[in-house]
């Protein structure tokens, strides 16, 4: 039986940081993400920069203990609704899971 784990990423956790960078870089290299790898300078600074932002958070998904997806989010505020909101900046699913229904939880 498969296992699914969803966690709020700790930007200072080396394993979670590596998983975040690997998933995001995979997305960046896909045509949907621009078709180019993240620049080395971005890879070197992204985790520290995200950690400095109190309104940033990343949710990581693991399937069978392997990184399967992420969502990068930023807290904001809607002036039209006068309420807080979550801006979803990146949504990534590992290419190995694209088109697969073996993980359907319905």
What positions do the PLM features span?
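Short coil/turn motifs at secondary-structure junctions
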Residues: 76-78, 96
């Amino acid at each position: 039986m498969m296992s699914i784990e969803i966690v709020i990423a700790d930007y200072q956790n080396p394993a979670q940081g590596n998983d975040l960078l690997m998933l995001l870089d995979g997305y960046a290299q896909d045509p949907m993400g621009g078709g180019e790898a993240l620049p080395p300078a971005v890879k070197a600074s992204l985790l520290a920069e995200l950690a400095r932002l109190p309104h940033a958070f990343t949710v990581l998904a693991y399937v069978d203990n392997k990184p399967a997806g992420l969502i990068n989010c930023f807290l904001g505020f809607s002036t039209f609704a006068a309420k807080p909101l979550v801006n979803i900046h990146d949504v990534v699913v590992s290419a190995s899971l694209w088109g697969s229904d073996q993980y359907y939880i319905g």
